[in-house]
Amino acid sequence: MLLNLRLDGSSLHVLCSTKTLPISSPLDKFPSFKKLKQNYVPGTHESDKGPQRSTRNGDRGCGTVAHEVVAGKNLLLVNPSNGCVGKSGIIDGFVDKRSKDARFGGNGLVSEVHTKCSTKRLSYGGCIPAILEALDSIEDVEDALSPWAERLSNKERTIILKEQIHWERAVEIFEWFKSKGCYELNVIHYNIMLRILGKACKWRYVQSLWDEMIRKGIKPINSTYGTLIDVYSKGGLKVHALCWLGKMSKIGMQPDEVTTGIVLQMYKKAREFQKAEEFFKKWSCDENKADSHVCLSSYTYNTMIDTYGKSGQIKEASETFKRMLEEGIVPTTVTFNTMIHIYGNNGQLGEVTSLMKTMKLHCAPDTRTYNILISLHTKNNDIERAGAYFKEMKDDGLKPDPVSYRTLLYAFSIRHMVEEAEGLIAEMDDDNVEIDEYTQSALTRMYVEAEMLEKSWSWFKRFHVAGNMSSEGYSANIDAYGERGYLSEAERVFICCQEVNKRTVIEYNVMIKAYGISKSCEKACELFESMMSYGVTPDKCTYNTLVQILASADMPHKGRCYLEKMRETGYVSDCIPYCAVISSFVKLGQLNMAEEVYKEMVEYNIEPDVVVYGVLINAFADTGNVQQAMSYVEAMKEAGIPGNSVIYNSLIKLYTKVGYLDEAEAIYRKLLQSCNKTQYPDVYTSNCMINLYSERSMVRKAEAIFDSMKQRGEANEFTFAMMLCMYKKNGRFEEATQIAKQMREMKILTDPLSYNSVLGLFALDGRFKEAVETFKEMVSSGIQPDDSTFKSLGTILMKLGMSKKAVRKIEEIRKKEIKRGLELWISTLSSLVGIGDCVDEL
C-alpha cells in the first residue's frame, strides 16, 4: 500500500460519514434559488456552523448578477425583464423592494467587466455563451435552460457547472440536471460540485454529496480525492483532509501527481516540512517502481524545492533542482525565483549570481525575481547592488510594483540616504504608485534621525492633509518623534489625530510612551487621566506603559497607585507590572515596601516568576540578610520554579559576604551544570569563589577556577589581585611574583588596592627595584597612592638602612605638601635602590 496512515477507524468513520448529519443529500431539503434570493444570506445557513466564506470559482473571474446578499452593501443585479444592470438596495441582508430598477451611473465599470466575461464565454463556442447569459439573466433554472433541455452534452453540462460563481446556483442547476432523468451525471460533475461546495465551506453538503455518489455507484477517481483533500486543507480542516488521504490509501489507490502536489502544499502550509518530504519520497519511489519512465512536472518540483527551502534544507533543495534538470524538465520562472530566494536567504549570494545567469538562458526574469534580488541585497547591506537590480528591472521593460519601491525605499530610509529616498519618492509620484503607511512612517523616522525636522513635518503633513492615515499611521509617526525625544513634534501629531477624530487607545499609548522617554512623567499621568473624557478607554498596554515609566523614574509609590487601578479593571494577567514596582522600591532601598507589594501580588493570586524572586533574593543578598534571601529561595522552590544563573549568582554573592563556603560550592556546581561550552558563570561569581577559597588558603580549588577564567580570557584585575594575595599569604612568593609581573605586562593595574598588593609583595620579597618601578607607574598613571602604599614603601626604605625617624619625616612632608612629598619619596627610593631618578618626568 502506498501510504500507511495509522488512523483510528472510529475517528475515520466520524470524519467521513454522515451518521451525525441531519440531511442525506445536499438537495433533499434545499430551497429553490428563487427562495434563496428572497430570504437567504450567504454564510448564515442554519445547518452550517463551521467556518463560512464567500468564494468565486477561479475559472470565471466576474459576473453580472450578484446572487450573494451582503448586509449594508449595494450589489449588481440584472432586471430579468429588460436585462438592465443596476444597484440593489440592501437592508440588513434583504433586498429593498423600493429599488427595483436602480441602475449604475456611467462610470464604465459594469460594461468593462461584462465585456471581459462575454469574451470568456465566446471562447467556448457553440451554445455555451447563450446558456450562461440565460442563467445570469433568468432566475428560474427551468426557464433559463428550457431552450436546450434534453440536448446538453456531458461537456456542456461540465462547463455550465464549472462556470457558476455561487454555490447556491450551482446546486440548483445540478438538481435540475438530475430531475430531468435524461442526463447522466458522471464523476467529473460530482468533482466540480465537491469543489464548489468545499470552497464555500459547506462541509455537510460536501459529505452528503459524497454519500450520494457512493449510493449511486459513481466510483470516485484520483481527482475526486485530490479535490476533497484540497478543499478541506484550504478550509483549515487538515485532519479531515488527511482522513480523505487515508481513505484513498485504504482502497489501494495511489495519488497521481496532481493529488500529490495538493498533499505537499497542505503539509507546506502547515509548516510540516518533514512530513511533506517523507510523503514525497514514498510517492516518488512507488511511482518509479510502477513506471520507470514517469517524469514529474515542474509544478511538483517547484513545490518540493520550496518546501525544502522553507525548512532550511538547502542541500535537498539543490539536489531536487539538479534532478529536475537531469530529467529534462525546463525550470520555470517560479523555479528560479524559489532557488534564488533559498540561496539568498542563506547568504549564498555567489550562487544567486550564477542562477541569474542561468535563468536568463532559459526564461526571462519577472518583477518578483527582481524584488527578491533587491530584498536579498538590502538585507546583506549591499544597497548599491540592490539599486543596480532596480535599474536593470526597468531596463528590461519591467515595471516596478509597490513591493519593489517599498523594499528599496525602506532600505534607503534606515540608512538615512535622504537624497536617494527623495528621488525614489519623486519617481513613485510620477508613476502614481501609492505610498503605504509603513513606508510613510519609515520616511518620517529617516528625516527625524537625520535631524531634518522641517522636512519630516512637511512629509507627515502631506499624508495627514490627504486624510487617508489610519490610527496605526498616526501612532507610528508619534513614535518616530517620541523615540528621539522630540516631544513637541510628537504632541503636534497627536493633536492632528484629534483634528480628524482618529484618536484611539493606540495613539494614547504611544504618546504616553513618548512622555516616558522624555522623563515627563507628570504629563504622562495627565494624558492618562484625560483619556476617558475623550471616550477612549485605557487598555492593558496603557497601564503597563505608565507603570513601567513611573517605576523606572524612581516613582514606585505613584506607579503602585496605577497598578492598583490596573488590577481593578482586570488587566493584570501576569507579574510583570508588579515586578517593575518591586524593582523600583529595591533600587531606592525600600525593601519593606518591595516585600509589601510582593505579598499583595500573592494575595491576588498573581504568581511571581523567576525575575521577581531574583530581584528580591539579590536585594537581600546585597544587605547580607541570609534569612530573608533564603525565604524567597524556598518560596521559589515550592512554586516549582527552577533557579537560573541570576539567582545562583545572587546566592553566591550572599554566601561570600557571610562566609558560607559549602553552600556557595553547592550553588556554583549547579551553575556549572547549567552552563555549556559557550556559557560560563560570570566573572563576579567566579571571583567570589576565588575569594572564598583564598581566605581559607584552598589554593588548588582557587587555581582551578583561575586557570579556567584565564583560558576564556575572563580573568580581570581583581581575579589576579586575589590570587596574588593568596599566594603571598601562604608564603608562595614565586607564584605571587609571576602574578604581579603578568598584571604589569597586561597593563591591568587600575585600582589602588591592586597596586598596593603588588607593592606589598615586592617589599616583602625584597624586590625593591620592581617596587620602585611599580610605584612610578602608579603615580604617572594618575592613581592616587594612599597610606597603605607608603607603608609598603617605608618598609623598603628601612630595609635599605634608613631610620624609622627619617622615613616618618618624609611622610610628614608628603602630608603637608603632596607634590613635593611625592618627589621626595621617589628620589629617596631611587637613590637607595640604585635606579635613575625620574622625578622630572612625573
Swiss-Prot record:
One of its GO terms (biological process) is singlet oxygen-mediated programmed cell death. Transmembrane segments: none annotated. Belongs to the PPR family. P subfamily. GO terms for cellular component: chloroplast. This is Pentatricopeptide repeat-containing protein At3g23020. PPR repeats lie at residues 186-220, 221-255, 256-290, 297-331, 332-362, 366-400, 401-435, 436-470, 474-500, 504-538, 539-573, 574-608, 609-643, 644-674, 682-712, 716-750, 751-785, 786-820. Residues 45-59 have a biased composition (Basic and acidic residues). Residues 40-61 are annotated as: Disordered. The keyword Signal does not apply. NCBIfam families: PPR (TIGR00756). Keywords: Repeat.
